[in-house]
Amino acid sequence: MAHRELAWTCEDGTRMHGCVWHPEQRSNIGGVVGLVHGMGEHMGRYVHVAQMLNEAGYAVIGFDQRGHGRTEGKRGHAPTYEALMEGVDRLLTEAASGYPGVPVFLLAHSMGGNVALNYLLRKQPDIAGAIVTGPWLKLAFKPPSLQVAIGRIVERIYPSYTNDRPLKAANLTTDPEMIQRYLNDPLGHGQITAKFFFSMLRAGRWAIEHANELRVPTLMMHATEDRVTSSVASKQFADNAGPLCEWIGWDGFRHELMNELRREEVFDTIRRWLDGRLAR
């Protein structure tokens, strides 16, 4: 597996950090997959996913979103929701230019799934397909009403106010090794600003309401026991989207399907779905 890093500067001066992984023999590349990570994450958490895809003949390109990993900016914050979608747009541009003539896919998780789905619906990109795991369309729990009401006021008067509340590692996976990696990760964080949080809530609702406008073949997978994001909401999205969106529920799994003990089953499903799209 060959690896290189890339970087670019956004119009507002924010320096973005990305990574590319591809098979040693570039002639063996059948497709390129753009990775979009979740809240508090970074591309370093997806090396094993990139390796799996490389071994299956897919190049992989990903980037640390604004306020995450080695990309600049206040942790857990973005100036606008549009700025997050611009990151996905740049990701797909890099994928297409780096591997001309090769089918391009998206693979997005959690918060990244929210952004990716909104990008698919609002921008209607010409790509071969998308895979979304555990998308944050709605939370799996209901925050206290008073806390939400205060948060909405804070969003208006102090949008960059930060709440530091890391996710419980045990809610992410049942794999002890992956839990330890998560806890020891120096680039991971649990920070999110008021503006970022409510932007996600609004975008999630919008995506569900407009799911029937989906034009890109999509595989959506969710842990049925997810304690972070709502599997009911992602199933609702898939139902609204119609036959173009296939939904798979994973019993006995937690939020991070690709970090679970039985992740090889998930990887197998991903590979078969991607290969199936290439065969069409």
PLM regions and their residue ranges:
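Conserved alpha/beta-hydrolase
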Residues: 50-73
